[in-house]
Amino acid sequence: MNVKGKVILSMLVVSTVMVVFWEYINSPEGSFLWIYHSKNPEVGDSSTQKGWWFPSWFHDGTPSNQEEEDIDKEKRREKEQRKEDDEEELQLWDWFNPKKRPEVVTVTSWKAPVVWEGTYNKAILENYYAKQKITVGLTVFAVGRYIEHYLEEFITSANRYFMVGHKVIFYIMLDDISKMPLIELGPLRSFKVFEIKPEKRWQDISMMRMKTIGEHILAHIQHEVDFLFCMDVDQVFQDNFGVETLGQSVAQLQAWWYKADPDEFTYERRKESAAYIPFGEGDFYYHAAIFGGTPIQVLNITRECFKGILQDKKNDIEAEWHDESHLNKYFLLNKPSKILSPEYCWDFHIGLPSDIKIVKISWQTKHYNLVRNNV
């Protein structure tokens, strides 16, 4: 074949390839992909979010007519699905039986369930939420020496026990992202790592997380998950922490105080503080190590708590238990729709009384002299 023939043949081959690619990118399968990395985490900060996007080749970013039709079809399908889901909405008594645990408080005065082992029907819940195709987020903060002492075990155990069988996104907030451990996540699990500003005092770290969580919910989390939990890093999952914990707003009973009288609780008792709760008031003592709900409800929680923290700073006062004091004040005024028993956040230093059937999460040993920069 002469040179002219080779040129013509090459041009035909290139044209064919381009036509094939053009047909592919204008098909539904040619849409862009979002890649979550297990070993190479996405890195961001509190105001921006970076990711890796792989657009279809030769795509100018403008949807084709076919793509617009596909989007419209998908929207109609989702609308119909939501209508069906509303008709099949799971009722409390479909899955919850308080009589299974008569020795403990299982229903609050405002009719919210207190979830203990044995009170819920796991099969019904799993079947319901599997149809919903939910995504659950989990935020955790690790700064300074908390990273090396607690983070890897927390994430590894969460990977094993948190919302098994459902899509999960871990939102990991670090003051030094270079110390992020390499962790291989299981199926349906991904994580995003964000760098946060270091604080001089651990008390400020604890309180400022309310602001940071709220910022991230507004920036992206509200569009990424259906439910969100916020947890302390110095604890470890021991057993399945599943969909029985999901709700509009979820509070955690504090292990040391769940049997105490409200007047014994370590609420903030000074009237000058925004977290003030007078004697004679209060329902339960809630642990700030775990709280959650829908993204919008968690946003409300963090906003109101941070508002109280700022008010206290303005008045030159600091609540006794920092963000936890403000969280208890919030839940006094805005009752949680679901409460988790101490089984979901237990301290083995208490022992193991008969009403604690299965420990879902346990406290880690508190090495405050090692991990806090001001004790």
UniProtKB/Swiss-Prot annotation:
Q: Where is the composition biased (Basic and acidic residues)?
A: 72-83
Q: Which cofactor does it need?
A: Mn(2+)
Membrane-related topology note: Single-pass type II membrane protein
Query: Hey, what's the signal peptide range on this chain?
Result: none
Membrane-spanning ranges: 7-25
> Could you say which EC number(s) this protein's record lists?
2.4.1.87
The note describing how and how many cofactors are bound reads:
Binds 1 Mn(2+) ion per subunit.
**Binding positions for Mn(2+)?**
D232, D234
Positions glycosylated per UniProt: N300
Keyword check for Isomerase: no
In residue numbers, the region (Disordered) covers 57-83
Catalytic residues at E324 (nucleophile)
Please provide the record's free-text comment about the domains of this protein: The conserved DXD motif is involved in cofactor binding. The manganese ion interacts with the beta-phosphate group of UDP and may also have a role in catalysis.
Q: Entry's PANTHER family? A: GLYCOSYLTRANSFERASE-RELATED (PTHR10462), N-ACETYLLACTOSAMINIDE ALPHA-1,3-GALACTOSYLTRANSFERASE (PTHR10462:SF26)
Family, according to the entry, reads as follows: Belongs to the glycosyltransferase 6 family.
Q: What is this protein called?
A: N-acetyllactosaminide alpha-1,3-galactosyltransferase
Gene name of this polypeptide: GGTA1
